[in-house]
UniProtKB/Swiss-Prot annotation:
Name this polypeptide is given: Testin
Keywords tagged on the record: Cell junction, Cytoplasm, LIM domain, Metal-binding, Repeat, Zinc
PET domain span: 92-199
Database matches in CDD domains: LIM1_Testin, LIM2_Testin, LIM3_Testin, PET_testin
Coiled-coil regions, chain positions: none
One matching Pfam family: PET
Length: 421
């Protein structure tokens, strides 16, 4: 498919998750409705990950596409119908007998994802070493956490041009080259092993604790492997604490066999969240999630959340923006050359600010213009004018004077306060 055809085919899938309730806003949100180019709900302004959207197949497609054309193709399967790669995530089901008064019942626990290891006991140990609220048990807080991190850490629009808004053919080509590069140079999947098993990794290479190199060792020289294992001390690359014997550890191939992590320490160096499904990006001695690796390579538009591949973009309020996306957060009007106010780190045009966000003057009961001086005390505000900031009893101007506040009123003296009480 040529670039022109790809551009024409692009769309944001606006029907996906339509009407899903917001888990954050509850009944305040009318239901999920994707904004035309922002990755948020038009009704409540929360992200799709904050809504109860059923995305299991879509997320599996996204991760499957991420692993396509990499060494991790064993983790994907191609659908017979359309050839789309699907992520073969490992689901672990544990059954535990529960003693009852008359008979024994079976308690089943399903993990929506588990490390793809042959030893289920090792996978179970791994799960137990994660914080309980982050264990992806079906229907639990941990499963919701995993779903949210899949959306945040691995945005589809960081790897698939068709998920982006109106890219030019040149931008599509640059993005495809960028994705190909990070797949070959940074992308990896952690592996769970017992630390003592690390000695068997690599061609005739032995792990040297605390070192940054490996040495070639003749097999015959290993007189007492078990004794060597007992003497070895392994420490976590993140927290520097030692690994307990028999506890599972994570290693990242791109980091080298001399580095191990506790399961709960295998986190992004920027957001410090667990790397979802142990999918990592390695750069300059640090682990990153997909989002923050891409942020370290390319500017990201604060409006549409997409990476910027154009040479022309704007910077404002310590953020980057596509020229067409530096818009009012409320009405989407372009703000270039216009007066705007930052509200919760989002730019809002002056008319929308006055209409939706401006504080109301206690004196005249009108909205206070963002460019006008004001007097604020606790949660109350006044125009800093001789017409508004007045004694609530005698109407004396209080600008530059001492005053006595009582809820939304101000007084120039005890006498005036008593007269109004």
């Amino acid at each position: 498919m040529d670039l022109e055809a790809k551009v024409k085919k692009m769309g944001l899938g606006h029907e996906q998750g339509f009407g899903a309730p917001c888990l954050k806003c509850k009944e305040k949100c009318e239901g999920f409705e994707l904004h035309f180019w922002r990755k948020i709900c038009r009704n409540c302004k929360c992200g799709q990950e904050e809504h109860d959207v059923l995305l299991s197949n879509e997320e599996d497609r996204k991760v499957g596409k991420l692993f396509e054309d990499t060494k991790y193709t064993t983790l994907i399967a191609k659908l017979k119908s359309d050839g789309i790669p699907m992520y073969k995530r490992n689901v672990m089901i544990l059954t535990n007998p529960v003693a009852a008064k008359k008979n024994v019942s079976i308690n089943t626990v399903t993990y929506e994802w588990a490390p793809p290891v042959q030893n289920q006991a090792l996978a179970r140990q791994y799960m137990q070493m994660l914080p309980k609220e982050k264990q992806p048990v079906a229907g639990s807080e941990g499963a919701q956490y995993r779903k949210k991190q899949l959306a945040k850490q691995l945005p589809a629009h960081d790897q698939d041009p068709s998920k982006c808004h109106e890219l030019s053919p040149k931008e599509v080509k640059e993005m495809e080259q960028f994705v190909k590069k990070y797949k070959s140079e940074a992308l990896g999947v952690g592996d769970v092993k017992l630390p003592r098993d690390m000695n068997t990794q690599g061609p005739n290479k032995m792990y040297i604790p605390g070192g940054d190199r490996s040495t070639t060792t003749a097999v015959g020289a290993m007189e007492d492997k078990s004794a060597e294992h007992k003497r070895t001390q392994y420490s976590c690359y993140c927290c520097k604490l030692s690994m307990k014997e028999g506890d599972p550890a994570i290693y990242a191939e791109r980091a080298g066999y001399d580095k191990l992590w506790h399961p709960a320490c295998f986190v992004c160096s920027t957001c410090h969240e667990l790397l979802v499904d142990m999918i990592y990006f390695w750069k300059n001695g640090k682990l990153y999630c997909g989002r923050h690796y891409c942020d370290s390579e390319k500017p990201r538009c604060a409006g549409c959340d997409e990476l910027i591949f154009s040479n022309e973009y704007t910077q404002a309020e310590n953020q980057n923006w596509h020229l067409k996306h530096f818009c009012c957060f409320d009405c989407d009007n372009i703000l270039a050359g216009e007066i705007y106010v930052m509200v919760n780190d989002k730019p809002v045009c002056k008319p929308c600010y006055v209409k939706n966000h401006a504080v109301v003057c206690q004196g005249c009961h009108n909205a206070i213009d963002p460019e006008v001086q004001r007097v604020t005390y606790n949660n109350f505000s006044w125009h800093a004018s001789t017409e508004c900031f007045l004694c609530s009893c005698c109407s004396k101007c209080l600008i530059g004077q001492k005053f006595m506040p009582v809820e939304g009123m101000v007084f120039c003296s005890v006498e005036c306060k008593k007269m109004m009480s």
